[in-house]
Amino acid sequence: MIRVVRVLAAVVGLLLLTGCGADALPPAAHPAAPHEATQASPEPPTPPPEATTRRTFAPMRGGKPVLGGISYGPFRAGQKPGGPDPTPEQILEDLRILAPRWGMIRLYSSRGPSETILRTLQDESIPIQVMLGAWIAADDDEANATEVAEAIRLANSYPDQVLAVSVGNETQVSWSGHRSDRDRLIAHIKTVRASVKQPITTADDYNFWNKAESHEVADVVDFLLLHAYAMWNQQQLEDAVPWTARTIESIRKEHPGLPIVMGETGWATELNPEGDEVKYIKAPAGESEQARFFSEWTEWAADAAQPYFYFEAFDEPWKGSDDPREVEKHWGLYNEDRTPKQALKGVAP
């Protein structure tokens, strides 16, 4: 997902962020920043060597495979990364709301409320697994080292809860506001992978994964975590899921043999008609539009057996500009007050 300016971009102790992707953007689930699609590498890629040691991303719940997960940003009105944090009681409420429908959630940082979330899942025996994040900033080696160390500690301390670890979020795509050195990212990925038993990945936009240079990164991960937003890429609603399916297939051809998990996709329910987002979003936002996209996406994903994390669980009012219509605030399937939007009303888990 050029992005709406992030006011809180440099806050330390960040957790999630919102995938819907800015300069040291706080680790919250966030839509990928918009960018014009560019061509994939012209030459057919050489398939990677047989990865006999590749770890399998295989979420299970009650002995059955789990296909769909959701990005979880826990911050409510008056809360934000860096504090104040949600209370343990609020986190428990959220997890109880999510558990009937989703068997896995995605976090974007190893700090902030992340351990509270993992501990709550463990102590309350809530059957949700977590893709844990390690937020990698562009020019903060100390913070990055802390994120990596905490991700390793949490993955080893909560092995039943941590399903996988994603090291970095949208750090390589050309439009990223927190673009990181590729060699350092690869080193962080290798450090985490050598220290935990879970499968390891990094998340990025399709406009990185479709480039030849992405193979350097793809070679060191266990699976590819892909972001693709039809809404941010000037698609109309009727073509949103077909566009997303075509995008996934193009990345599959670029990286044959590497499993793909959809890390972020979604549809916003409000936008600021006077904001920068209208340069990239050409389709209407709204609850009925989100409901249609969510229904069509989940149906397609089930038919295609495509694992995914939908973006996102709850609206997050702290994000983006001060304008309450700011699109970054309105990607949740639930309102900030935890009431379901139209996409979930009357729909069985």
Tell where the protein language model's regions lie, with residue ranges.
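C-terminal motif of bacterial Sec signal peptides marking the signal peptidase cleavage site
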Residues: 18-19
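Aromatic-lined carbohydrate-recognition surfaces of secreted/lumenal glycan-active proteins
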Residues: 192-210, 258-266, 307-316
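Acidic (Asp/Glu)-rich catalytic clusters
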Residues: 59-65, 95-99, 115-127, 150-162, ...
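Active-site clefts of carbohydrate-active enzymes
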Residues: 173, 177, 228-232, 256-290, ...
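N-terminal carbohydrate-binding/catalytic regions of secreted carbohydrate-active enzymes
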Residues: 65-146
